[in-house]
Amino acid sequence: MATLTAPDAVAMDSQKLEQVKILFQKQISDGDHPGAGLAVYRYGNLVLDIHGGNMRDGQPVTDETMFVLMSSTKPLTASCLYMLKERGKISYEDLVSKHWPEFGQNGKETVTIGHILTHRGGFPQTPESFQPSDWPDWSKVVTAMEQAPTIYTPGETLAYHPINYGWVIGEIVRRVDGRSFTRFIAEELARPLNMFTTHVGPVSYTHLTLPTKRIV
């Protein structure tokens, strides 16, 4: 566990941090979040580390509790593509179908990697037949993304791709690099940054995860 640094030592206002702490505690007390944790760093120094609420089994949230990051993983996902670009393996102008031929159907023939990164791919919706119970099966993920139809012309309309974004990037990484996206992000990003409890995909930490109703 990291040692707390005095806010003044890193030019932070301790009173402002106290206000953040009070607001956090109020939101927990008011039931805005079933469980949450908040860590604030400045210049690599931990200045605030608080948690509160309960997991769905009634156990209190602690500094060891793990949370699903949801869309906070998008910057991590994009970073993986940037690594491949730096290594000369892809260009943002590449058609996705250059690296994943089966993707180029149902209106997605002209979708580029850059379109995916900027949410201009034109297929923000996940196929209705693809249910959350299918998500852990990567082969089904790949098939669903290949079959997904566009509802906008690629490159013309900004439309947030909440889920398809990560799935498409994950498969591009797998096809270009050869490693699964789970392995790539672990070996190339998480471990070098000492993020040993940050991972993609199901793992054996389920006893530490999930507040009662909503993911924070």
Q: Where on the chain are the PLM-derived regions?
A:
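Short, conserved catalytic-motif segment at the N-terminal edge
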Residues: D8-L69, S91-D94
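Short helix- or helix-capping micro-motifs
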Residues: N106-S129
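Alpha-helical scaffold elements that line and support the substrate/ligand-binding pocket
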Residues: L38-V40, G44-N45, V68-K89, L95, ...
